[in-house]
Amino acid sequence: MRDRLFSIIYKYNLHPNRDLGQNFLIVPDIIERNIERAEVGEKDTVLEIGPGLGVLTDPLSKRAGKVYAIEKDCRIVEILRREYNWPNVEIIEGDALKVEWPEFNKMVSNLPYQISSPVTFKLLSREFERAVLIFQLEFAERMVAKPGDKNYSRLSLMVRAKARAELVERIGKGAFWPRPKVDSAVVVLEPKPPEERIDLNENLVKALFQHRRSTVSAALKKSAHMLGLSKDKARELRQVFSRVPHSERRVFQLSPEDVLEIEEFLKKEGVIESYPASP
C-alpha cells in the first residue's frame, strides 16, 4: 500500500496541499483496524470524506456494498479516476461542507483537520449506524471529554447530546506523509437511540460556552447579546439569570440534560424562543 501511494505521488509529481489538510495515512494496519472497527460489510454504504490517494478507499471498496468518496481537490479526483477501477465507488468532487451528502449508514474517514468540527456537526444531523474517524488528538480529546474535565467544551456537550464517542487509538505523526505537526487519534461514534438524543438551542449553548469557566448565571449575563437581547433587556433579566437551574455551577460542569433544564426555564420566562434545534 505504501509503495503504491508513493509511486502515484512520484508519477504525478504530486505536492500535498497543506491548505486542504492533505496528510496521507501510510500505515496499513491502522487502515485495517478502522475498517474492522466500522464493521464494514457488503450490505453497508460507506461515506469517506477526503479519500486522498485511495489508501482507505481501496480496501473499503473490497468490503462495502457501496462507497461514496467526497474530494475537494480536482487533481486528486482525476488521479483516483485514472489509477483505480472501482465498480462500487462513486467519487463526488466538491466541498464536503457544501455538497449534498448521499445516503449512507457508515462513515470511515481520515478527515482534513480544519473541517473536523463542521463535519462532525453535519454528521450528527444525519441518521447513521457508526462512524470511525481520525482527528487531531486535541480535537478528539475534547470530543470525548466528560462534564467537569478541563477540556470539556461546546463540542463535547453537543456530541454527548446525540452520540456515544470513544477515543480508541492514538496515532503518531510518523503514520502520515507528509508528517503533520500534531498527533492524531481514532474516534468511534455511535448515535444514541432517538429517545435518548437531546436537541439543544444552539444559541444558548454558544452563549454559555463563550464563558465556560464562569458560573451559569455569570455566563448568561455576559453573553445575553448572543440570545438576541439588547443591553437594556439584559439588565432587566439579571434576576432571572440568577434564578436559572444550576446558576452557581461552572459551565464546563454541565451535562446536556443540565443545559436542557436551563433552556426550558428560560423559555418559560420568555427569555428565549424555540430557535431551530442544533444538529
From Swiss-Prot:
Pfam families: RrnaAD. GO terms for molecular function: RNA binding; rRNA (adenine-N6,N6-)-dimethyltransferase activity. SUPFAM superfamilies: S-adenosyl-L-methionine-dependent methyltransferases. Keywords: Cytoplasm, Methyltransferase, RNA-binding, rRNA processing, S-adenosyl-L-methionine, Transferase. It comes from the Archaea. Its main location: cytoplasm. It is found in: Cytoplasm. GO terms for cellular component: cytoplasm. Its EC number is 2.1.1.-. S-adenosyl-L-methionine binds at N23, L25, G50, E71, D95, N110. PROSITE patterns: RRNA_A_DIMETH, SAM_RNA_A_N6_MT. CDD domains: AdoMet_MTases. One of its GO terms (biological process) is rRNA methylation. Belongs to the class I-like SAM-binding methyltransferase superfamily. rRNA adenine N(6)-methyltransferase family. RsmA subfamily. Specifically dimethylates two adjacent adenosines in the loop of a conserved hairpin near the 3'-end of 16S rRNA in the 30S particle. May play a critical role in biogenesis of 30S subunits. HAMAP family: 16SrRNA_methyltr_A. This is Probable ribosomal RNA small subunit methyltransferase A. It comes from Thermococcus kodakarensis (strain ATCC BAA-918 / JCM 12380 / KOD1).
